[in-house]
Structures are given as C-alpha cells and as structure tokens.
Amino acid sequence: MSGSTLFSIGEALIDMIPSRVGCSFDEVPSFSPRTGGAPANVCAAFARLGGKSAFLSQLGDDPFGHKIARELEACGIDLSHLAFTDKANTALAFVSLEEDGSRTFSFYRKPSADLLYSPEQIDPAWFADAFALHYCSVSLVDSPMRYAHLCLLYTSPSPRDRQKSR
C-alpha cells in the first residue's frame, strides 16, 4: 500500500460516559453519549491532523448510528464505505471511570450492526489509494466482520504488486 488514504475497518460505537468518577455502575446518576470505537477514533485523529482517512463499518439505522455518522463526517472522514442496517443496533459501551483513571466497560453488542458488516459489502478497488489499513482485535470475533477483515487482508494490493505492474 503506497497511496495517501488511511483506511480503518471495525467498530464505531457510543461510549456512555458517567457523570461521576470513582463509583460503580449502579451508583452513577447519569451517562452522556460520546462517539467512540478505536477504528473510528484512529480515522478521526488522522483526519484532524490533516490526513485523508476512510472508515469501513456498519451502524444501526438508529439515532446513535446517525449521531456517529454526523460526528465522523464533521471530522472530514470519508464515509462512502459506511453502511446502515435495520438488522441490529449500534453498539453501546457503558464506561465506569475510577479516580486513578482506570476504566471498566460493559458492552451491548450481541450482535451489533458493525459485527454484521460482511465481505460482500467490500470492493477491493476501493483500496487503490490506500497507504495503510488499521483494524482492532475486537472485530475479529467469529462474525461477518471477521471475514470482512480477512477479505481486505487477502485482496488489498501490496506495494510489491504495484511495483510489478509498472
């Protein structure tokens, strides 16, 4: 890969951030929704630094999914490979924050929309301008998303292939 776009595949979710630090989940009075998910965060950070990034995933066709899409688009991320589905909801992660900064997560994603993203939704031609593919291990569970990752790894053009074709 020697193009100019960072591609990231995997989860985008809503982190439910507690209004109070240092207490257990059952003691938290309220939570605030924030866009999260490591692959989405990597795209956002790279775009904010002036890079070109594209996000591949699937969100629920629900208010949280549309909130995530609006916020990622506002960062300047290419969302042309983002899908929506009514077959599952957008993933949620409730976060507990300790005084020392450590975190505990409780995930709601059985299955979530991102895990249903499948190889059939990917066109290898998208990656002609890719310089890197980022992904995280969370999406490698036995799901259609796992096979979408494998599809990318086996079909994305490598720098050696590009040099041979010149």
Please report, for each region that a protein language model flagged, where it lies by residue.
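Conserved small/polar residues in nucleotide/adenosyl-binding loops
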Residues: 154-159
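Flexible, glycine- and charge-enriched loops at secondary-structure boundaries
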Residues: 32, 142, 146
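Conserved N-terminal subdomain of the carbohydrate kinase-like
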Residues: 52-137, 142
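Short secondary-structure boundary/capping segments within folded domains
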Residues: 45-48, 84-85, 160
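Glycine-rich phosphate/adenosyl-contacting loop at the front of the ribokinase-like
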Residues: 1-78, 117-119
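Charged helix-capping and loop-helix junction motifs
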Residues: 147-151
